[in-house]
Amino acid sequence: MSKRGARTPGYWYDNTPIPLPARMLAPVYGAVTAVRRSLYRRGWLKRHGVPVPVVVIGNVTAGGTGKTPLTITLVSRLQQAGWTPGVASRGYGRDDAGTARWVDADTPVALGGDEPVLIAWKTGARVRVDTDRLAAARALVEAGCDIIVCDDGLQHYRLARDVEIEVVDGQRRYGNGRMLPAGPLREPAARARECDFRVVNLGQGSDAVIPVVGTPVADTDAGFGEWQMRLSIDSVQPMDGKRARPLASLAGQRVHAVAGIAHPERFFAMLRARGIGVVPHAFPDHHVYRAQDFSFGSRLPVLMTEKDAVKCRPFADEWLYSVPLKAELPAAFWVSLLDRLDKLASRHSDA
């Protein structure tokens, strides 16, 4: 198995001893985080809104939890419901991180960031990358968007929000419960209870959806419950432009599987569960691929996540395939969320 680059520290999620420097820095990080949040709560630091509903998708832990598949699915659902959503993102990993820009499906990943380019490619929505989420939201409103989806902006308190959706890994949850860098927490785990919706990413698991906390459909302004999300794969898309084929057509075959995501083993496990023989190649999250990265020494199909695929389009050939990932949540979740957003739209129009 190829392993390149840094990985999530093991002590975040197991009983490995925490290094002394990390233990010493965690209280400092926690104190700074608490002071900053308190300043916003007391109004000493001001929040600024925009004249349309704002939905923030984020997490209180560092690392991937499935926010991007959920963002793509949410944007698609909003479009189907008649909204014109715009997506605000920081665009992590791009070369000119300090520059605000519009992102579409053809934007080079080095300029737009892999996740924003993927979102634009999959949805066709307006996407704006900017370290200042408020400025991004304002630009999207000026461009005609009537709802803002903020990708990974839970801690960006300067932008006022109407709905918060927290996404958490169903297996790892909040790890050892410690603040960065001693643990995975960006904020105390209790912060998650303040969010309107909690989505638990089960990965490739049962499609049964059970609300655990709160009421899944309610008329109140908060406490819409905890929902389980399942990620599914059922097809592969040749990157040379040919038609997609069922993933089942590769059952019993060996493939090279490439993943430059926070938890690459999840992708490999999903392929194995479909009866595919996986030769795994894990790369760092947000890795910038070169053609040489795919010199594996054996000519087998190369399967990769769509997040990786958007970075490989310049040198794609007939051996490279992307695997679309779908986020599946219960119908009641969408009823609850869309009903809330309809009410918010009325409030904003009356303001």
From Swiss-Prot:
ATP binds at T61, A62, G63, G64, T65, G66, K67, T68. It comes from the Bacteria. GO terms for biological process: lipid A biosynthetic process; lipopolysaccharide core region biosynthetic process. Pathway: Glycolipid biosynthesis; lipid IV(A) biosynthesis; lipid IV(A) from (3R)-3-hydroxytetradecanoyl-[acyl-carrier-protein] and UDP-N-acetyl-alpha-D-glucosamine: step 6/6. It catalyses: a lipid A disaccharide + ATP = a lipid IVA + ADP + H(+). Keywords: ATP-binding, Kinase, Lipid A biosynthesis, Lipid biosynthesis, Lipid metabolism, Nucleotide-binding, Transferase. GO terms for cellular component: plasma membrane. GO terms for molecular function: ATP binding; tetraacyldisaccharide 4'-kinase activity. SUPFAM superfamilies: P-loop containing nucleoside triphosphate hydrolases. Pfam families: LpxK. Transfers the gamma-phosphate of ATP to the 4'-position of a tetraacyldisaccharide 1-phosphate intermediate (termed DS-1-P) to form tetraacyldisaccharide 1,4'-bis-phosphate (lipid IVA). NCBIfam families: lpxK. This is Tetraacyldisaccharide 4'-kinase. It comes from Xanthomonas campestris pv. campestris (strain ATCC 33913 / DSM 3586 / NCPPB 528 / LMG 568 / P 25). The gene is lpxK.
